Amino acid sequence: MYELEINEQMVPFNFGMGFLREINKRTSIPVEGMQNVRQNVGLRYSVAKLLDGDVEALVEVLDIANTGCDPRVTKKALDFFIDSEDTDIDEVFEKTLGFLKTANATRNVTLDVIKEVEKEKQKREAMERMKMEAMA
């Protein structure tokens, strides 16, 4: 169980199998070469959105992870927490990604997405360097 202090209250979050099943079914893609077969990939998309700083994705991830926990935090309370000047939003993103990196159910996919994003970033930087060198 993971916790964040939200509106002066410790709120629990569970990034286990229930979380994984729920978030995965939010986004599905067709499986290449297989007619009428789809694969649930919601966690992959959500991790990528978190890495991009998508605040809506952050609220969705926290809301799903709090399902079945006590106390249950509402989306309205999460919105208030995110909007508060006292909230360090970068820290909330870091902690949430940290939870996803360490929970057994989400660790491998999260680390894989982070690795892929880093590879793409390095490719883009290399292309930019090549363009700059070609222009010089």
Per-range role (PLM):
Residues 26, 50-55:
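Active-site- and interface-proximal helix/loop "cap" or "latch" segments in soluble metabolic
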Residues 1-10, 31-48, 56, 68-136:
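Charged interaction scaffolds used for protein-protein
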Residues 19, 47-51:
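Generic hydrophobic, helix-prone segments enriched in Leu/Val/Ile
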